[in-house]
Design a protein with these regions (language model features):
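A short, surface-exposed loop/turn module that caps and links secondary-structure elements
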Residues: 30-62
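Generic alpha-helical propensity signal that fires on short helical segments
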Residues: 22-24, 35, 50, 71-72, ...
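Generic ordered-secondary-structure signal
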Residues: 4, 26-29, 40, 72, ...
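Enriched for short, Lys/Arg-rich terminal
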Residues: 1, 12-16, 56-88
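Extended aliphatic helical segments
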Residues: 25-28, 53-54, 68-69
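Arg/Lys-rich, positively charged N-terminal/basic patches that mediate binding to nucleic acids
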Residues: 1-30
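Noncatalytic linker/hinge segments flanking ATPase motor cores
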Residues: 21, 44-47, 68-69
Length: 88
């Protein structure tokens, strides 16, 4: 099983989300542990990892749309959630 965890900036943003938005983001974090390649690929300069994003619609969060940006390393079998970008 892949480990998925939040970076310090993502943890800070997480505290600013509503309870339903936090629950939706936590659901993504848990699902990354089972399927780390589920997000859409992003341009990445590091050949040893992949940058990806999972986009949550307002209907899924009960609030704003949220993009969960993360990096997956196959060598470490881990996902680091770098940013949580919340829309209007």
């Amino acid at each position: 099983m892949t480990h998925a965890f939040f970076s310090d900036p993502a943890e800070k943003i997480l505290t600013e989300l509503t309870p339903t938005e936090r629950a939706a983001v936590e659901s993504v974090r848990r699902s990354l542990e089972d399927d780390p390649a589920q997000g859409r690929g992003l341009p990445d300069a590091d050949p040893r990892s992949e940058s990806r994003v999972v986009e949550l619609l307002p209907e899924q969060t009960g609030g704003r749309g949220i993009s969960v940006v993360y990096r997956y390393s196959q060598d470490l079998d881990a996902c680091l959630i770098l940013w949580l970008i919340a829309g209007p």
